[in-house]
Amino acid sequence: MSDTPIRTVFFISDGTGITAETLGHSLLAQFPGARFRQVRVPFVDDLDKALDCARQIRETAVTDGVRPIVFSTLVNPDPLSGLREIDALFVDLFEQFINPLEAELGQRSTHTVGRFHGIAESSDYKARIEAINFAMAHDDGVSTDGELADADVILVGVSRSGKTPTSLYLAVQFGVKAANYPLIPEDFERNKLPGELHRHRSKLFGLTIAPERLSQIRQERRPNSRYASIENCRFEIDAAQKLMRRENIQWLDSTSKSIEEISATILQAVRLNRPVY
């Protein structure tokens, strides 16, 4: 793989570039044997900026000795015209989909920059902020029984199994109110859920993780402690899984899963149909 040339990939947009980068990453991930250097170029909203971007792409082609790959979500025809003649693999992500949709729907698109993000922010921004605040206020078991009633989902699992980042991702991306609750040795000794969780069992979803990975994560937090020892991690993971099986809680091993995969699985499991913001 070290002999494989590095290809420079540009993500060009007249907005933030997030859409171009997200779609581009999904496509590039299908080529694990390739190596890429990624460059995001946002806010290319006039011809001068597009021509400057075209110059950067030409210089990169000369330096690399191979033409770059360009993912574009430009909708304004003026800056788009400044990039049409560059020596690169030019992937116009909007053109691939907008033209067929216009033909199918029988109407012209608005070609408005950032149109999707504007709609999302105007209708759902408040709900997303509320979900983020909820996740932060109900992290690591900091919840009363009454507050848990407002949760869309309650994540359970041992400490450092990925509950907090998943809760925040669900809030930011989907506006889901996610609380999380750590399973601790006292729960394992009782071999049952705390009362406040038991009353909301329908909202529970468990996260587990390989003991070796858990020990590695905990060592970074508390080096050479019993908390981080592989023996303790094995005990906690085994006890947590037994408890979740006994309580019939759906759970997922997060060891080799991305946060996107974990979140999608949770949404499907608890039947939450939410749009991505």
Curated annotation (Swiss-Prot):
Keywords: Kinase, Nucleotide-binding, Serine/threonine-protein kinase, Transferase. The keyword Transferase applies. It is an enzyme of class 2 (transferase). GO terms for molecular function: ADP binding; ATP binding; phosphotransferase activity, phosphate group as acceptor; protein serine/threonine kinase activity. Its EC number is 2.7.11.33, 2.7.4.28. ADP binds at G157, V158, S159, R160, S161, G162, K163, T164. Transmembrane segments: none annotated. It catalyses: [pyruvate, water dikinase] + ADP = [pyruvate, water dikinase]-phosphate + AMP + H(+); [pyruvate, water dikinase]-phosphate + phosphate + H(+) = [pyruvate, water dikinase] + diphosphate. HAMAP family: PSRP. Belongs to the pyruvate, phosphate/water dikinase regulatory protein family. PSRP subfamily. Bifunctional serine/threonine kinase and phosphorylase involved in the regulation of the phosphoenolpyruvate synthase (PEPS) by catalyzing its phosphorylation/dephosphorylation. PANTHER family: PYRUVATE, PHOSPHATE DIKINASE REGULATORY PROTEIN 1, CHLOROPLASTIC. This is Putative phosphoenolpyruvate synthase regulatory protein. It comes from Aromatoleum aromaticum (strain DSM 19018 / LMG 30748 / EbN1) (Azoarcus sp. (strain EbN1)). The lineage of its organism: Bacteria, Pseudomonadati, Pseudomonadota, Betaproteobacteria, Rhodocyclales.
